[in-house]
């Protein structure tokens, strides 16, 4: 049932329309008021009153279900913890109307390619303070003729026809970039950090500290598109996602300067939409120096975990 998630009147009318259409008015109804927006909660509450039907609410953090037969009768039931190791199970629970454009599963062939670039990703991370200020220059270089030729500050970076050459302070890397050419630009101006973090987390995956590690997922929910009033689906992009068997974790990787607070709002909102109230969102920043004081306050207010060093250790302990 498609609704405008921020218009309680629209939601309420859609519920009545749905029940009438399917002949549910005289059936025994019970409303689940868990999740969604506050407007959805209020509309569901009003609908339950209209039908004089009970409703329930699941407190995820307390692991209990609150059942309301009427406003004066509340029963509480403990919910046994069931391990959820599959990322998409969280999506099924919280957004059954999801659409997955890119599932983020790294197959053996893709993993080999990431491993081939691992030394380059490590080198870029090691010298990130010198690389990041060159992002715009690299982008402009590539835009001209799909080549990159940078030589400054004891650093050489060259790219043409899938051939990559990087030399920083005498440390040299030659490799053939086997992906789509346009993907290399995305990689060199920030995608390397996503791959760097992914490789860091592989050890936690092997130790079964985390499960179902995904990279670069793209998802959409019908209500997200309906809210924007568009026909084309609006996709949420998750840089990295995984489970610890209890909660969904969503990681946003940022190597360059972060100016747009909307990125943080989207991270927080998408994490709760796809993983529920207990889902955890992490911002991985290559350095806290790229974050202004206002941005850092926003991160704190949105309950986002900021990690800028010892990534594997800090993520494991979060």
Predicted feature locations:
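Long, low-complexity, Lys/Arg-enriched
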Residues: 1-28, 42-236, 246-247, 256-318
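Gly/Ser/Thr-rich loops at beta-strand to alpha-helix junctions
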Residues: 32-43
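Anionic group-transfer/hydrolysis microenvironments
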Residues: 34, 239-241, 254
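Active-site beta-strand-loop-beta-strand hairpin of nuclease catalytic cores
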Residues: 241-250
């Amino acid at each position: 049932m498609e609704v405008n998630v921020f218009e309680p009147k629209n939601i309420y009318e859609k519920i009545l329309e749905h029940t009438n259409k399917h002949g549910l008015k005289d059936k025994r109804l019970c409303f689940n008021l868990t999740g969604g927006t506050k407007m959805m909660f209020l509309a569901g509450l009003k609908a339950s009153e209209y039908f004089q039907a009970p409703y329930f609410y699941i407190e995820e953090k307390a692991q209990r279900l609150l059942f309301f037969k009427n406003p004066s009768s509340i029963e509480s039931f403990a919910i046994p913890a069931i391990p959820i190791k599959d990322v998409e199970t969280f999506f099924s629970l919280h957004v059954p109307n999801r659409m997955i454009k890119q599932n983020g599963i790294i197959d053996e062939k893709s993993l080999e390619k990431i491993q081939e670039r691992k030394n380059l990703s490590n080198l870029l991370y090691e010298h990130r303070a010198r690389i990041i200020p060159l992002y715009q220059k690299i982008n402009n270089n590539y835009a001209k003729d799909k080549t990159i030729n940078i030589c400054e500050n004891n650093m050489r970076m060259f790219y043409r026809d899938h051939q990559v050459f990087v030399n920083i302070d005498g440390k040299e890397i030659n490799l053939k970039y086997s992906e789509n050419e346009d993907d290399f630009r995305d990689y060199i101006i920030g995608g390397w950090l996503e791959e760097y973090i992914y490789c860091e987390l592989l050890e936690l995956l092997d130790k079964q500290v985390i499960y179902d590690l995904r990279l670069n997922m793209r998802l959409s929910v019908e209500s997200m598109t309906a809210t924007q009033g568009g026909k084309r689906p609006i996709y949420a992009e998750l840089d990295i996602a995984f489970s610890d068997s209890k909660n969904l974790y969503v990681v946003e990787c940022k190597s360059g300067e972060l100016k747009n607070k909307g990125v943080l709002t989207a991270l927080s909102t998408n994490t709760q939409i796809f993983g529920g109230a207990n889902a955890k969102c992490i911002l991985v920043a290559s350095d806290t120096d790229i974050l202004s004081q206002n941005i850092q306050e926003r991160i704190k207010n949105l309950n986002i975990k900021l990690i800028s060093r010892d990534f594997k250790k800090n993520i494991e302990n979060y």
